[in-house]
Amino acid sequence: MKTKKLLTALAVLSVVFFTGCKNDEPTNVDNPTAIPTQTTKQAEVALNGASNFAVLAGAAITSTGATNITGDLGLSPGSSVGGFPPGVLVGTQQVNNPIATQAKLDLTAAYNDIAGRTSTDIVTLSGNIGGLTLTPGLYKTTSSLAVSSGDLTFDAKGDANAIFIIQIASTLTTTSGRKVILKGSAKASNIFWQVGSSATFGTTSVFKGTIMAMQSITFATGASLDGQALARTGSVVLAGNTIVKP
């Protein structure tokens, strides 16, 4: 009898252990209260010639109001840059020249790099990610993401070199006043957003990271970015914004 009870107990423990250890498939998260911690560390992202640009676009760059940009501004193959002045650029302007052309080529390479990354413990997000705390690693969605209900936090858990990559198949949006918050030594320069179409940031929203959008990036009045706004084929539209390249 004792032997039978012992074997039964061991069988139960075996089922629990092997079930709990299975982690071969991506983790799906739909408005979760807790995000799984990833063990796979992401390698650095090489922006090369695009690394000095706070704003880089393909078609045009337009600004209204008192926009302030710290970092270089580049455009290629387009040639239309408007709004400086009254906008203030603390950096150099490179328009349809060899420097801007190379920066766009390097942006394309970096975009393709992060878009193609995979991981055994990648976390799949969907819909509104406001209110969540993301730890280092690779995240993806097959549709769009929004920071629309609560602020979004990145927690590097004390690792100042930790990399965050978010792959977005379609659009990225924030609603008015929403913020991205950094904690645990997280750095804006280590957060990378790969956006399959366009990104739009609501009035007075505060965002962080390098945004690499396939199409356009639009900032509503008073929105700010601690990072880089890099649009591959479309325009970057500004309206009294503050953008500081880390």
Task: Say what each PLM segment does.
Residues 1-9:
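Bacterial N-terminal signal peptides that target proteins for export
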Residues 17-20:
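C-terminal motif of bacterial Sec signal peptides marking the signal peptidase cleavage site
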